Amino acid sequence: MAYSFTERKRIRKSFGTRDSVLEVPYLLQMQKDAYTAFLQADKEPRKRTIEGLQAAFDAAFPIVSHNGFVEMKFIEYNLARPAFDVRECQTRGLTFASAVRAKVQLIIYDRESSTSQSKVVKEVKEQEVYMGEVPLMTDKGSFIINGTERVIVSQLHRSPGVFFEHDKGKTHGSGKLLFSARIIPYRGSWLDFEFDPKDILYFRVDRRRKMPVTILLKAIGLNPESILANFFVNDNFRLMDSGAQMEFVPERLRGEVARFDITDKSGKLIVAKDKRVTARHTRDLEQSGSTHISVPEDFLVGRVVARTIVDADSGEILAKANDELTEALLKKLRSAAVRELQCIYTNELDQGAYISHTLRSDETVDEFAARVAIYRMMRPGEPPTEDAVQALFQRLFYNPDTYDLSRVGRMKFNARIGRDESTGPMVLSNEDILAVVKILVDLRNGNGEVDDIDHLGNRRVRCVGELAENQYRTGLARIEKAVKERLGQAEQEPLMPHDLINSKPISAALKEFFGASQLSQFMDQTNPLAEITHKRRVSALGPGGLTRERAGFEVRDVHVTHYGRVCPIETPEGPNIGLINSLALYARLNEYGFIETPYRRVVGGMVTNDIDYLSAIEEGKYVIAQANAVLDKEGRLTGDLVSAREKGESILCAADRVRYMDVSPAQIVSVAASLVPFLEHDDANRALMGANMSRQAVPVLRPEKPLVGTGIERVAAIDSGTVVTATRGGSVDYVDATRIVVRVNDDETVAGEVGVDIYNLIKYQRSNQNTNIHQRPIVKKGDRLVKGDVIADGASTDLGEIAIGQNMLIAFMPWNGYNFEDSILISERVVSEDRYTSIHIEELVVMARDTKLGAEEITRDIPNLSEQQLNRLDESGIIYVGAEVQPGDTLVGKVTPKGETTLTPEEKLLRAIFGEKASDVKDTSLRVEQGSQGTVIDVQVFTREGIARDKRAQQIIDDELKRFRLDLNDQLRIVEADAFERIEKLLLGRVANGGPHKLLKGAKIDKPYLSSVEKFHWFDIRPAQDEVAAQLELIKDALEQTRHSFDLAFEEKKKKLTQGDELPAGVLKMVKVYLAVKRRLQPGDKMAGRHGNKGVVSKIVPVEDMPYMADGTPADIVLNPLGVPSRMNIGQVLEVHLGWASKGIGQRIGDMLQQQAKAAELRKFLDKVYNARGRTEDLAQLCDEELVAMAAHLRHGMPYATPVFDGASEEEIKDMLKIAYPDEIAQRKGLTATRTQAFLYDGRTGERFERPTTIGYMHYLKLHHLVDDKMHARSTGPYSLVTQQPLGGKAQFGGQRFGEMEVWALEAYGAAYVLQEMLTVKSDDVAGRTKVYESIVKGEHAIEAGMPESFNVLVKEIRSLGLDIELERS
């Protein structure tokens, strides 16, 4: 395999034993595909499929007026180009969206000429109508809503279809299983069927009052006879003068206890009374040729009549279907000469009489009565007219406008009720309802299985596209109502479509969804991993999903079908555990929204490289081997028994039974979990914490690649969009800190396209979490690039790999109690080298509004401020970029008009004379908050249309235009150079007809001539050949065209920048100031490894006091060894060992470079490291120069990849340690024989510690829980309104709560005065607080405690209950 630009600089040595059959797919595929399918922007309108926006429009149109003579038809929709790009939207606080314009026709039919069969068109009006704005997805899979980046999380919800379940015996005291079924449509009423403890079957619509199911069956057109015929088989009886003859059916007799003597037709006794009928008995009966059995009279009593019996002579109904036979009824039947009788066959075991009993409890008589009963249940209190009753019943399940099963629902429904076809109508049919009731009765009879609702075959994912489509449909439905009412007017008045359609409901629905839905979330941008995980998240919460409170254990638990689809590790701790999951690494969605995972096909024990994606439903049919199954050289499964999975259970089976095999061992985990090396050695709880905390790592100043990784780092970094990748191949033409200019390869440019790519890098941009997004170029001028190469690193990436922490030398040993209970002891060297220093950017906003008393003004002229306090503001009153500010410093000067106070005549006179204006305004400037300081790195000024810009705003616009012009000039420079190169090739050696500088006719054009002529005059040369002249003219036109398009682009940019900004109502001007704050590591900051080993920095120790090795190397971090055994995260120990080997090999390479070893020697050593164990690397691809350059990158540590579940073994780590530390080096460092431990020395005393200490390198992270953000102090501040107690929390500048337990502590000490102080003057004794202040000012330190306000509140509350309470003064 060929190495990419960054891989050539640093190849990661992998211990994976299996070659990748399938590359890790693009990690944001799910989000991007879903939204592309929703918009279908790049498809021609005629070729769009019916999904997304197209489906929403098709469902809403055509709209027909109430009288039917006016109709509005939808033709097609178009998406406009967004007015602002992503960066402009972020800066200006706008939504990155595109306007939807729908082409509609308003058709008016002629009333006079039209008949009921055909309508004659009178007039057609066609017009494009604005249909609201649809937010667009950025390249990174997020949305910009009101200037902030948001993510729409996919929702895992119960799939539409039919589900059968039971209550597990919880409802009834006896523990009896009550079965139920539920038909869930995508849109429309839910239909439930359920048994009660008395075995009567009921149905409910939308969880309303329950009714016997036979009412529904009658309502769909079945009569009692056909209901019984559908659910029961019949026993045929022939009535005799006494008793009867029953038709002999062997299956029905077998196993029953005979209630009478059974004889064959000759009268021979076959089964005696009270004996069980066996198979031998039924065989004897069959052999004797008996077709009927004589049964006594009492055998018939209590049987249920299957069909209505009518007297043939009189027409009188003798017995109705479902009547029970009594002796009287039998007598009546005999007297009416009824000989043949059909009764339903039931038994206790597998043919319960449930429907018969239900029918008996149902009082409705016919179809209409049943529908009236349903109407009364749905609309209690409304009079049931015939039309209303029929209309309601039709609307419930049979009307496509109100009921939609969806394609998924129909597919699942048909599969569950045993139909072969997967398509069908989107509404229910009578057969569907009947089939569901039949299956439910079968379940109650003991046949079949209930469904598992947590099976991923019964839960599907709703993606962004689908969620947005549902919102758009909602908006269109509201429009449809309004248009329908107004369509009638279009006949009388000359209205156009845009007069009828008001797009507000659509905009409102979309705005509400993207801005405020539970599934639209503020993007987690702490680091690239957090970003990518957020977009791959799958939530069971949200509208139409579960709620935290109601979700039980089963829903949250890991299910066997999660394998390869949903990560079993990465989920939040706390109330959302198991409800929010992450998609597994290779998972994708199928057309129905079910999660699929890839498997390699196995044919006759031979593993092929063909890949099939299976959903959870399909997977259950096959035997699937694990990814680490042993294969021989030909790729055949070896061994008698292979470890595999069948229906979710682990089994051992023969190789020829295996049909599929896992693609990769990492297939079961998510991106975050797959970045944890040695994950297989960590306890699941700690692995969960490790995966979750990796997402909270703060990007540090200088990212450093992990020495021990898993090989997914590069994929994750590229797919997250944090790094900049080359969109086309080419050579680097120009690089500086802010932009990279690439001259594109000729074969990758399309004719007429500019052959240059300019990448503007992001510099010091604030993320959603206030961390710093900053890109650094990693290419130099002249570098050759291939499409997809990483050309600039972003936050938390190093040479195109995710790097969320720093590699630290860790020693596992206690140190004076400073690492007790997971505390972390850290060396001062780490702080002084800025290893964990991070930059945080805060955005401070000030608005000048138009108030009732006049407009606020942003100005430098502020009352009562000295020149000293204003010296950092420019003449517009805005701070300059680069100023270092402290708490309380003014950032933007602003004054607000004050209300006019009533003045005495003298004051009025003085003011008239001296014009003292300053007291009219008050100072409302933007200042730096307490506890915050930093450097101003950027200022943005926004001005409303029609208000003059100040100098600062104009300067910002000029700078922006200058930058844009620079880009255009670069593009033009390269395009021109390219064009003149082509012209030179075209003209050299050609004969000319004349040209500038007195070129004679017939002269040959050569290089000296061309270099003597100005390039722009080359176009004046007249070649003799016509085709050459034509080509020259073409190049000239293309250049002119390019220049013109660049000028247009510049003008458009200028227009955008100079037009007024959209600001909130009443705001005239807005200034945003960005402060960059440097945060160094300090005690109280939270840190963690990648294995859930978290802790808080307890002390930063001078480097000379840290434990050190025999060669003088001091440890960076000292961790408590007791944090490992009980937590069972042994992965950290293995990481430390392999990290130690990595550093040792790096040092050996560094030594070789320092001694200027020959390239061949270097190659030999690297070949030994890379190709001794694990996956081999082809170093022959690298020339000597590249090899030495790579070695320079390896000198600080050899990067390893130990893939999840396929990582480095103990032997491999030992081998690497042996290569890294030969005996001589090991001795010098004081290492033990295993090379994993060393004898350390106490930095303070120089004494050697008694026992060897485990030491090595671990990738350690600083988390986004910084003590600076949490610590604050309050002396006086805001108080709660009712209780008058200080507020709580940093945001409210609150105090520390002195709670119940703290009061007990003071009581225990008997500190009465301290306690009184705490409960009164330091809390809510208002008068007392003021008096204490006064006494302190006067220098007297006396306390006069009064009544706490909260006590007064308590008294008032007791009085409000009607209990009088009074205080007695003692």
Curated annotation (Swiss-Prot):
The keyword Acyltransferase does not apply. It comes from the Bacteria. It is an enzyme of class 2 (transferase). GO terms for biological process: DNA-templated transcription. InterPro entries: DNA-dir_RNA_pol_bsu_external_1, DNA-dir_RNA_pol_su2, DNA-dir_RNAP_su2_dom, DNA-dir_RNAP_su2_hyb_sf, RNA_pol_bsu_bac, RNA_pol_bsu_CS, RNA_pol_bsu_protrusion, RNA_pol_Rpb2_2. Disulfide bonds: none annotated. GO terms for cellular component: DNA-directed RNA polymerase complex. PROSITE patterns: RNA_POL_BETA. One of its GO terms (molecular function) is ribonucleoside binding. The RNAP catalytic core consists of 2 alpha, 1 beta, 1 beta' and 1 omega subunit. When a sigma factor is associated with the core the holoenzyme is formed, which can initiate transcription. PANTHER family: DNA-DIRECTED RNA POLYMERASE I SUBUNIT 2. DNA-dependent RNA polymerase catalyzes the transcription of DNA into RNA using the four ribonucleoside triphosphates as substrates. This is DNA-directed RNA polymerase subunit beta. The gene is rpoB.
